[in-house]
């Protein structure tokens, strides 16, 4: 009690100490939070002061309109800008474009607004002085770079700022810098697929651009994530986009020469009290001083309107240094040139011979330059009768499923326009713009567009009713969702391996939701001669590997790519030619089979008969130590003897826990369990079982079938048959690895065939008219050795087996290397036929009748085969490919076959035979080269099961150990295995697979059972399992194509 009390006091003391520490930490956290709040409040106060200062500057700018005059005899337009002492004038001009985006960073880290370069009044250069004014975009938290950025980052920024090259881009993919590999993700911009952004200057050495999002965020942009939006036939210059935040520079649109387009990015709002596109502020934009657009006159003004004439004035354009030469102005009336004024004269014109009282005229002014004329609609106005503020001739063109282009004729190019879509304000279009591009619309939907004109100043010369008419409407409907657009720029190059080519393309433009023409893009398909040869399921994929074997089988010279979607496929892209050198098949390599190496065993070979030997190299590769009755040692997969091939690596069974069970005890357990089940079985069910057993398809095969030498006699499927070895000539059940299954390009419909034991497929070819084996020149049966010391002393069974296999006569006997089996260490008292080899490839195999097989999986010997000479000896193939096979498979489990005029070896566990109805059908399959993509598995299975009159036999096994796959199994797919307890009677269907597992049934549940946990029920004990029929005639369920592995206990 005393110790308990002391312990309690100690715990209470520790609890109090922990509470004290917790309180101290909480107080520290609160102090940190309060400090952060105070810091944020201070920043907010500073920003508010700067905002007020900027507002006062803007008021001054509204009162004093800036102007830009043309100076110099070289006809080079220069800005009328007050110069700072010691600062070259060219530096102002070169930095003007990017200063709008980035600004010249002042001493406090803020950005200079364009007002730094705007004169307040006067038409002549004043004394050099400049009053700095800084702009902080408070509503955009990342509108400027942090002051902590390194010097390299700042130098890159300065370099791009001075270049003046601005480009509009669209993000091809979404990108989160914090998920990327770079060490400074805060210096990069997050991207959203389909969104627009601006990049400055050239790409740096790391492949990044200096960029800015439409909300003002700036940072690095990976070049492979963006596409430039620029028409080679159009003059392009990007402008900043107007946003919902308090950006005081109005950014909007793309202006194209004679075809200006404003792109819709997102619903935006601009405070009309701040943004003024009229005469109150200098309307300077990137397109005004860009290199790719013809500068246009600004701010056309109606100075005087008379009955027969009008006087108009304008301001000269802003021409970047080195852009070109502006020679004169053209004054047009209704697109007809009335006069031409030389550059340097007064920017005013008197236009006569007009009837303004009865007619309406459109007056326009354009620049004549060495690089073409400017757009007349960027400097235009209407005069005369019935002039209203609203725009006219609204049109919607280029309507697609998700986009449309709106255009109009402005009453005055100084007016800005507000765009409404379905009565919701969408965006503001700046002055001198008359087109707008809608994106992200919904397919097959009606829209109503309203354009509201906003004059830069009230047109008092117009009557009230004409001033009030300030809007125009138009309606349109988008197209129904249709096929997506095809990919572009398709090319074919050499692939990663010699057996494939790489097809690359540029995906079509997608919306942020992954739509193309309103269709939900799911992937891309590669086609050759109208047949799909490859498919990739990824909306943003830009390439796929295509196996050359398919292209050669189709004799294709070019490929095309289609965009796949839920609404169908697109049209074919432009054909891409396949380089001829890639289509040339490699020269065939004749196979020289190495002589088989005799096998030895630790058993006395005299007990096994004259034809039974064990591979010495296999025995040498075994780890040291005794082998017990049901203990299993993993074989060494790296010590395969010379001359042997490995269709697929072996797998290892789980190990029983506890002491090993001796053979005597195992027999006793099996007998006791069998007798216990037999006593509890009902007589009626036992009678039914006996009737079904006696009526089985193999019951009387001994009496019905005779054997001619040297053929091996086929017996009924009794338990003794399976204890001594199968005589049905069945092909081993080969389980395929996950790598074969997952690489299937068509969902592996064909791979479902492998769920049927492959020995059944082979036996239906080998057995004729009641169970005879097809005649062959030699006897190809071979015995798999159970090289276990526990088999010593069972010479009677070994001798019996030896006698059976020395039964043949009248012809030469062929001996083959014995394939080492997992059962070699299990101490089982029956010999599994899973590794029996049916034949060896004869030198004249091509002279035998050809058989048609279909590939169940993709197979590339270079990457998938464990054999060193795979590239020369083995053939690659694709799932569904038709293969011509000569003869039976050899001792290593390989067929000799032909694909694309090349002979080589084919692993038996990767193909399945097809039974053609006649020669014409066989020729058709060979010409086609591949099974059609839509061939149902049921049709193939019916074909291969036709003529088969036997079912998979069943046997009874007793469990020697408890087995819970969730605890004892080292495999991933534990749900595929059965749970059982010691003494349970399990019905086993067919033979053991090469992994060492049976397919069995217990209490109505079916699954895989490790063979080293089971013991055969003795033949002299009659057992009837009421829930298991004597012959299992149904296909086992799909097995997960995963290699089974285990760890030693």
Swiss-Prot record:
Source organism superkingdom: Eukaryota
Functional summary from the UniProt entry: Plays a role in the synaptic transmission as bifunctional linker that interacts simultaneously with RIMS1, RIMS2, CACNA1D and CACNA1B.
Keywords: Cell membrane, Membrane, Phosphoprotein, Repeat, SH3 domain, Synapse
Start and end residues of each Fibronectin type-III domain: 294-387, 390-471, 486-587
Phylogenetic placement of the source organism: Eukaryota, Metazoa, Chordata, Craniata, Vertebrata
Main location: membrane
GO annotation, cellular component aspect: calyx of Held; glutamatergic synapse; plasma membrane; presynaptic active zone cytoplasmic component
Biased composition (Pro residues): 582-598
Annotated GO MF terms: structural constituent of presynaptic active zone; voltage-gated calcium channel activity involved in regulation of presynaptic cytosolic calcium levels; voltage-gated monoatomic ion channel activity involved in regulation of presynaptic membrane potential
Protein name as catalogued: RIMS-binding protein 2
Keyword Repeat annotated: yes
Modified residues (Phosphothreonine): 841
Positions carrying Phosphoserine: 701, 709, 832, 839
Subcellular location: Cell membrane; Synapse
Subunit structure: Interacts with CACNA1D and CACNA1B, and potentially with other Ca(2+) channel alpha-1 isoforms. Interacts with RIMS1 and RIMS2.
SUPFAM superfamilies reported in the protein's UniProt record: Fibronectin type III, SH3-domain
């Amino acid at each position: 009690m005393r110790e308990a009390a002391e312990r309690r006091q100690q715990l209470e003391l520790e609890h109090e100490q922990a509470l004290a520490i917790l309180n101290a930490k909480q107080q520290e956290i609160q102090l940190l939070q309060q400090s952060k709040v105070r810091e944020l409040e201070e920043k907010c106060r500073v920003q508010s002061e700067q905002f007020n200062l900027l507002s006062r500057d803007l008021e001054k700018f509204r009162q004093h309109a800036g102007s830009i005059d043309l100076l110099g005899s070289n006809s080079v337009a220069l800005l009328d800008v007050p110069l700072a002492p010691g600062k070259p004038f060219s530096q102002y001009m070169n930095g003007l474009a990017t200063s709008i985006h980035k600004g010249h960073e002042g001493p406090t880290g803020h950005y200079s607004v364009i007002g730094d370069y705007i004169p307040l009044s006067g038409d002549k250069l004043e004394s050099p002085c400049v009053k700095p004014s800084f702009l902080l975009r408070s509503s955009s938290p990342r509108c400027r770079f942090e002051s902590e950025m390194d010097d390299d980052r700042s130098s890159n920024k300065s370099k791009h700022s001075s270049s003046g090259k601005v480009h509009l881009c669209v993000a091809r993919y979404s990108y989160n810098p914090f998920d990327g590999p770079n060490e400074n993700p805060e210096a990069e911009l997050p991207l959203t697929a389909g969104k627009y952004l601006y990049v400055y200057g050239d790409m740096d050495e790391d492949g990044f651009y200096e960029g800015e999002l439409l909300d003002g965020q700036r940072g690095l942009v990976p070049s492979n994530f963006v596409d430039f939006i620029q028409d080679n036939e159009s003059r392009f210059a990007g402008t900043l986009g107007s946003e919902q935040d308090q950006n005081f520079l109005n950014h909007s649109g793309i202006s194209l020469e004679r075809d200006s387009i404003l792109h819709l990015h997102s619903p935006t709002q601009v405070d009309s009290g701040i943004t003024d596109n009229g005469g109150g502020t200098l309307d300077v934009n990137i397109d005004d001083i860009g290199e790719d657009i013809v500068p246009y006159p600004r701010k056309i003004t109606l100075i005087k309107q008379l009955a027969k004439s009008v006087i108009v004035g304008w301001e000269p354009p802003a021409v970047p240094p080195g852009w070109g030469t502006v020679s004169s102005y053209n004054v047009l009336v209704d697109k007809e040139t009335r006069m031409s004024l030389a550059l340097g004269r007064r920017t005013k014109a008197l236009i006569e011979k007009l009837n303004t009282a009865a007619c309406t005229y459109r007056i326009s002014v354009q620049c004549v330059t060495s690089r073409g004329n400017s757009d007349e609609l960027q400097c235009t106005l209407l005069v005369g009768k019935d002039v209203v503020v609203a725009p006219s001739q609204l049109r919607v063109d280029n309507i697609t499923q998700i986009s449309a282009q709106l255009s109009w004729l402005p009453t005055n190019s100084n007016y800005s326009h507000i765009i409404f879509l379905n009565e919701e304000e969408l965006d503001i279009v700046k002055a001198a713009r008359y087109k707008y591009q809608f994106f992200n619309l919904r397919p097959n939907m009606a829209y109503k567009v309203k354009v509201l004109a906003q004059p830069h100043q009230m047109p008092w010369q117009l009557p009230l009713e004409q001033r009030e008419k300030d809007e125009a409407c138009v309606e349109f409907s988008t197209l129904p969702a249709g096929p997506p657009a095809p990919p572009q720029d398709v090319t074919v190059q050499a692939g990663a391996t010699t057996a494939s080519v790489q097809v690359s393309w540029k995906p079509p433009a997608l919306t942020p939701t992954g739509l193309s023409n309103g269709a939900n893009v799911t992937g891309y398909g590669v086609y050759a001669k109208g047949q799909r040869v490859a498919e990739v399921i990824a909306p943003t994929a830009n390439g796929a590997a295509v196996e050359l074997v398919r292209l050669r089988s189709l004799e294709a010279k070019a490929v095309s790519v289609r965009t796949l979607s839920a609404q169908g496929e697109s049209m074919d892209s432009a054909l891409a030619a396949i380089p001829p050198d890639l289509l040339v098949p490699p020269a065939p390599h004749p196979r020289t089979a190495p002589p088989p190496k005799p096998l030895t065993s630790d058993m006395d070979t005299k007990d096994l008969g004259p034809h039974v030997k064990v591979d010495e190299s296999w025995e040498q590769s075994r780890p040291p130590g005794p082998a017990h009755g049901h203990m299993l040692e993993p074989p060494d997969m790296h010590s395969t003897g010379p001359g042997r091939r490995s269709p697929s690596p072996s797998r290892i069974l789980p190990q029983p826990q506890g002491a090993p069970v001796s053979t005597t005890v195992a027999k006793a357990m099996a007998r006791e369990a069998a007798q216990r089940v037999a006593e509890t079985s009902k007589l009626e069910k036992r009678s039914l079982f006996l009737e079904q057993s006696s009526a089985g398809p193999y019951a009387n095969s001994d009496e019905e079938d005779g054997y001619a030498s040297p053929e091996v006699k086929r017996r009924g499927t009794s338990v003794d048959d399976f204890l001594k070895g199968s005589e049905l000539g069945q092909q081993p059940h080969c389980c395929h690895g996950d790598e074969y299954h997952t690489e299937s390009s068509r969902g592996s419909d064909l791979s479902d065939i492998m769920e049927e034991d492959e020995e059944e497929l082979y036996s239906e070819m080998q057995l004729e008219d009641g169970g005879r084996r097809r005649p062959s020149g030699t006897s190809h049966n071979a015995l798999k050795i159970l090289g276990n010391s526990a088999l010593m002393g069972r010479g009677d069974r070994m001798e019996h087996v030896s006698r059976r296999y020395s039964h043949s006569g009248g012809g030469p006997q062929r001996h083959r290397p014995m394939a080492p089996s997992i059962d070699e260490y299990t101490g089982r008292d029956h010999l599994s036929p899973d590794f029996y080899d049916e034949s060896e490839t004869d030198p004249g195999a091509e002279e035998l009748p050809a058989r048609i097989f279909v590939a169940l999986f993709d197979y590339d010997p270079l990457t998938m085969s464990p054999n060193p000479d795979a590239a020369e000896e083995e053939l690659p193939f694709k799932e569904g490919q038709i293969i011509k096979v000569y003869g039976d498979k050899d001792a290593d489990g390989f067929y000799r076959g032909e694909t694309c005029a090349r002979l080589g070896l084919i692993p038996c566990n990767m193909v399945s035979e097809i039974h053609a109805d006649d020669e014409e059908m066989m020729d058709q399959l060979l010409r086609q080269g591949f099974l059609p993509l839509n061939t149902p598995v049921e049709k193939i299975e019916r074909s291969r099961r036709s003529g088969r009159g036997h079912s998979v036999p069943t046997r009874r096994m007793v469990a020697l150990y408890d087995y819970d796959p969730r605890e004892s199994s080292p495999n991933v797919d534990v749900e595929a295995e059965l749970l059982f307890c010691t003494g349970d009677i399990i019905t086993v269907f067919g033979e053991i697979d090469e992994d060492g597992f049976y397919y069995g049934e217990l209490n109505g549940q079916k699954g895989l059972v490790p063979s080293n946990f089971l013991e055969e029920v003795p033949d002299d004990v009659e057992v009837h399992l009421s829930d298991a029929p004597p012959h299992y005639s149904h296909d086992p369920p799909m097995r997960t194509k995963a290699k089974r592995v285990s760890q030693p206990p």
